[in-house]
Structures are given as C-alpha cells and as structure tokens.
Amino acid sequence: MNSASVPQGMDLANRRAWQTADAVHRFRQEGWTDPGEAAAVSLVAPEARGAPILDIGVGAGRTVPLLTAISQDYTAVDYTPALVALCRQRHPTRRILHMDARDLSAFADAAFGLVVFSYNGIDAVGYDDRMTVLREVNRVLRPGGLFVVSTHNRTGPGFGERPLSWFRFTPNPLRMGWRVLNAVRSLPDVVHYLHNRRLHYDGPGYSVRTAAAHHFGIVIVYATMQEQERELAETGFQCEAVFSNDDGRRLAEGEDLSGTWWFHFVARKTASPAAGA
C-alpha cells in the first residue's frame, strides 16, 4: 500500500476498534492516565482557570471531572458515536458533541482559552490530517491560548510492538503448555497485526505502526519529540514544556527518551499558521 492510502486505512481500522465493546469498556477508566498528564494539566491550570475549555477525544468522559475542576465553561467532542452516547449518559449536564477534530467549524475563531487532546488521540489520524487538527486547534484558540496534547514516542519502548514477541521455547512441558495456550488466545492479535501491517509507513521524524492496544486493532503515529515540536511550531504554537508519561518529569532536549512511552506537550498559540501551511 502506498503512503497516500495510509490515512484512509488508519481511519477505518481505528474507527472500527473504538466501537468495540472492549474499547468502550477501557474508556470507562477514571483519573489521570499517568503522572505526565497530571503534570501537564497542573502546569496550565492556574492560567486556564475559568476560561472556556475544549476537550477533544473525550471518549467515555474520563477527563470531564479533571477539566471541569479548572473551569465550568466546558465543551467536549469525540468522533465515535458510541463513546459520545456513553459520555452523555455519564455526564448528562455537560456539553458533549459528536465532532471530528479535523473539522471544528462549529466553533468560532478564538473561542477557547485551553484545548486538551488527551490519551494520544491525535495519533489516530495520518500525518496530513494531524496537521489539519493542529491548524484547527490553533484557529479555535484565543491568542496566547494553551494547548495540551499527547503523542506516542517513536524512540520509546512501545514502538514496533508485535504479537507473540514474548513467546519462547522451554523444555519444561507445563510452562510450554501454558505458553502455547496463551499463543492460541492471542490469535486475534496476530490476525489484526497482519491485516494492519500493510499500513505501516515511515516519514521524516515519525512512523505509522500497529499498536498493541485493543488487541493490535489500532494503527497510530509515533513521533520523535523534535518532530512534534516542529509540527507545533509550523502550525503557530510555541512549545513551553514536555513531560514524560512514565514518571511525570519535565523533559529536556538531548536526554535519554528510551523509557518514555509517550509525551505530553504544553504549547501556546503565538501566531496563526499561513493558509495551506
């Protein structure tokens, strides 16, 4: 499959995965995903207090109580109907809309003071669509507004995961029996991986790969820290901080990132990107 076909294939695979019962169950979790997310939101909270917030990729509503603690002027969107319905059921008094982050035309320019796109949701679309999302976020943010976004690390431990990578022969018949049984149980993972492998693609500073989540049912973008900073700069943002998911530490250029599964970026709108940029 050529690179031009990757975004459509990603969309089909990921939309299918988000609507499974397993995905809906997983999205019911509560609280912070990791220390890095907590650190990133804590950094922007004082400045965003009381400002209108847009929560992109809200899923089943995990982030609703976390962000409404900062401001009651809150709007959430997600592009998966089943998750929007569940989120509305769990948070009936909140404004939850069915919307794709690539098209936020329902919102006026400069409508929000803070936009959050959590749980690596931006990774679920191809590179060109990713840039479209960033331009749309820039448009709906006020001048000087803040953006929190997470993305998978191409140099981290999650990049290049494969089903059955744990399988090893052992002369112990009991252990080998359990391993074979678990391998049989993992057959759906293998089928998904082999089906999605045709979508794998490498670009400058980023790659598209099948991820282990949802039984290897999703295909996502993995980016280097420098690439994500470049994308933000190109779409009118200045990166103010980057946090590691594993321990919440603030990352610096040049340090070892091999233990970081994904990044949490805090960026500020400094300009509007040129048309078509």
Question: Could you tell me what each predicted segment is?
Answer:
Residues 114-128:
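A short SAM/SAH-binding and catalytic strip from SAM-dependent methyltransferases
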Residues 252-277:
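Core SAM-dependent methyltransferase catalytic element
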Residues 1-59, 66, 260:
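Conserved class I S-adenosyl-L-methionine
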Residues 60-103:
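Class I SAM-dependent methyltransferase SAM/SAH-binding core
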Residues 150, 154-231:
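SAM-dependent methyltransferase
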Residues 131-143:
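A short glycine-rich, Lys/Arg-flanked "PGG" loop and its adjoining helix->strand segment in the class I
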Residues 102-115:
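A short acidic, Gly/Pro-enriched loop at the edge of an enzyme's catalytic core
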